[in-house]
Regions:
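Short beta-alpha junctions and helix-cap segments that line functional grooves
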Residues: 243-244, 316, 411-413
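Terminal RNA-binding accessory module
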Residues: 343-445
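Active-site proximal loops enriched in glycine and acidic residues that flank catalytic Cys/His/Asp
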Residues: 197, 233, 261-263, 299-303, ...
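Short, hinge-like loop/turn segments at secondary-structure boundaries
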Residues: 93-94, 115-118, 211-213, 247-248, ...
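Conserved SAM/AdoMet-binding glycine-rich loop
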Residues: 74-76, 84, 89, 187-311, ...
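Radical SAM enzyme [4Fe-4S]-AdoMet core and its adjacent flexible, acidic
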Residues: 10, 204-221, 225, 271-275, ...
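Conserved, mostly hydrophobic/aromatic
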Residues: 178, 195, 231, 259, ...
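Proteins enriched for Cys/Gly/acidic motifs involved in redox and nucleic-acid/cofactor modification
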Residues: 1-203, 242, 253, 257, ...
């Protein structure tokens, strides 16, 4: 069958989508890019926050129209929304033929076969299962970077988060399996390996009785063809000395960490169910910058959490101003059904949430521009992402920029550069989140 595959949500969901694509293509199905030519449509959904839920519902409804019209013979819904609303989806949208839970994506071929035969198919395995590899994952990111999901689930149970009930308890993917995946990804042209999970820093605790992310990183550095290794989703309180040391020792590991802190008011952190205090956060950030002076730190914040006062907001603003994160994103709090935070007193009006978010982002723009300006004159290694249409310029990323969420380097040159290659670039200018540069005199290695 000709299959259109739509992947919504985070990079962890994308990793699942790529596994399903591998299973589908391995069983003779053809992947197509448009609804009009698709015999079947698969939607891997997200429902982490309200906007993501809305996008998932709208996408399902839109694709259901092709089922009604008769051009699409099978409509399959997978992922977090499928896990959360398993009964409601097929009851309210009868055009949906099959629904797969978060640990059941390995059944995608069976689901497609059942749907093609006119049967309604539901599969919801234990959410604490660890799905098997497809063995031939399809890289959809353009080929030069890819996401390696090193664990499933989460044990933190923050009061605003629904993920543990959708993705199960924390369980690490065995090291041997990850090394095999990394080697396969490298064989497909991946140069940058990006480690993701609901939380990466406690990798190994369930399998080996201790944190072993540093050991995994050291072994991944031996994979031929991989040039950069980047780690996302690190809980700040779980950063440990051996991890810092391996980042200092191994040249392939980007001096970059994503540390979602969510807030800086101790009162709000406690209400969120977070396991750090502001003082601990300051200590962790200070230590990282002392040990790895050129480290780039990214964080994410939630503004407008229930009970957040103007005083709490100002405390967060001051923290952002003092800590000067290199990269920062802000979400307005989104009440999620079934979470403790949903029923907490002191719900903040949407308009005020957005005002507070905008204030933080305005401050961060100033910080980001200042940090970018400080880079002028430096030579940085850049991974080329592609050419700017109609111009003698390319887009690339430095070690300090993760795909999709961070900035870009605009490289002005008449030379021919290839996507996925690396070039040394001299920084000549800065914008709020992006840099401008030109090829260094000796730009190739």
């Amino acid at each position: 069958m000709k299959v259109l595959f739509i992947s919504l949500g985070c990079d962890k969901n994308l990793a699942d989508s790529e596994e399903m694509l591998g299973l589908l293509t391995g069983n003779g199905h053809e992947i197509v890019d448009s609804e009009e030519e698709a015999d079947a449509i698969v939607i891997n959904t997200c429902c982490f926050i309200h906007d993501a839920k809305e996008e998932s519902v709208n996408t399902i409804l839109e694709m259901a129209e092709y089922k009604k019209a008769g051009t699409c013979k099978a409509l399959i819904v997978t992922g977090c929304m499928a896990q959360r609303y398993k009964e409601e989806i097929t009851e309210e949208i009868p055009e949906v033929d099959a629904v797969l839970g978060t640990t059941s994506y390995g059944d995608i071929v069976k689901a497609l076969n059942e749907a093609e035969a006119g049967h309604v198919f539901h599969e919801f395995r234990d959410i604490n299962d660890l799905p098997e590899d497809s063995g031939r994952r399809v890289i959809t990111t353009g080929g030069h970077f890819g996401y390696l999901k090193i664990a499933e689930g989460c044990d933190k149970h923050c009061t605003y988060c629904i993920i543990p009930s959708l993705r199960g308890k924390f369980r690490s993917v065995p090291e041997e399996r990850l090394l095999k995946q990394a080697e396969y990804m490298a064989s497909q042209g991946v140069r940058e390996l990006i480690l993701v999970a609901q939380e990466t820093t406690v990798y190994g605790t369930d399998l080996y009785g201790k944190k072993t992310l540093h050991i995994l990183l050291k072994k991944l550095c031996q994979v031929k063809g991989i040039r950069w290794i980047r780690v996302l989703y690190c809980y700040p309180e779980e950063i440990y000395d051996e991890l810092i040391q391996v980042m200092k020792e191994e040249k392939k590991i980007c001096h970059y960490l994503d540390l979602p802190i969510q807030h800086a008011s101790d009162r709000i952190l406690k209400r969120m169910g977070r396991r750090t205090s502001k003082a601990q956060l300051v200590g962790i950030i200070t230590k990282l910058r002392r040990e790895i002076p050129d480290i780039v730190l990214r964080t994410s914040l939630i503004t407008g959490f229930p009970g957040e006062t103007e005083e709490d907001h100002q405390e967060l603003m001051e923290f952002v101003d003092e800590m000067e994160f290199d990269r920062l994103g802000v979400f307005t709090y989104s009440p999620e059904e079934g979470t403790p935070a949903e029923t907490m007193e002191g719900q903040v009006p949407e308009e005020l949430k957005e005002e507070r978010r905008d204030e933080i982002m305005e401050l961060q723009q100033e910080i980001s521009l200042e940090k970018g300006t400080d880079r002028i004159g430096q030579e940085l290694l850049v991974m080329i992402e592609g050419k700017v249409s109609g111009e003698s310029a390319y887009i690339g990323r430095t070690y300090g920029d993760a795909p999709k969420v961070d900035g870009y380097m605009f490289v002005q040159t008449g030379e021919l550069l290839v996507t996925g290659d690396f070039a040394k670039v001299k920084v000549t200018g800065a914008m709020e989140y992006d840099l401008i540069g030109e090829l260094a005199d000796e730009y190739t290695e």
